A protein has these predicted regions:
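Glycine-rich flexible loops
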Residues: 1-151
Length: 151
């Protein structure tokens, strides 16, 4: 599990270094046994240690004494429960993706890389407050037959 925690940290730091998310925004998780490992709430990625990565069960249970998961843990849980093939989730707040998502429309197949999302477009999940079941439902709908979506 230590190696997987280190991988979560490595890619979390890349959110910042690759300018995909600023400071503490975004979150990353990786499926692990009967749950997943996820970045903690409000943590500065450059300072993360293995012990900071939080384990959340697929039932949504976690030990608060060991850390508080990202406020977006619920949609990670729902994706892992509904998409058995999902092994990891990256939720970034890039300037471009954020700008596009504010229009509430997906990305059409203007480039062959769109197909990497699993379809002929990238869907945009309908807006809902962060951390809610409603947001999870909207994300799952946007992910039908897809590997990626805008939020």
């Amino acid at each position: 599990m230590i190696n997987l925690r280190i991988e979560v940290i490595k890619y979390s730091k890349m959110l910042n270094t690759k300018k995909l998310s600023a400071l503490r925004s975004g979150n990353i998780s990786a499926r692990y046994k009967d749950g997943f490992l996820i970045t903690p709430s409000g943590a500065k990625y450059s300072l993360l240690k293995s012990k900071d990565i939080v384990f959340v069960s697929l039932k949504g249970e976690f030990d608060k004494k060991k850390g508080i998961p990202s406020s977006e843990w619920r949609f990670h849980q729902d994706i892992y429960n509904n998409k058995k093939e999902a092994k990891a989730i990256v939720h970034a707040h890039s300037n471009y993706a954020t700008a596009i998502s504010t229009h509430g429309k997906g990305i059409p197949a203007f480039h062959y890389m769109v197909a990497m999302a699993g379809g002929n477009d990238i869907k945009c999940a309908k807006y809902a407050t962060y951390g809610t079941r409603e947001l999870s439902k909207n994300i799952l709908k946007a992910l039908r037959q897809r590997n990626a979506c805008l939020i």
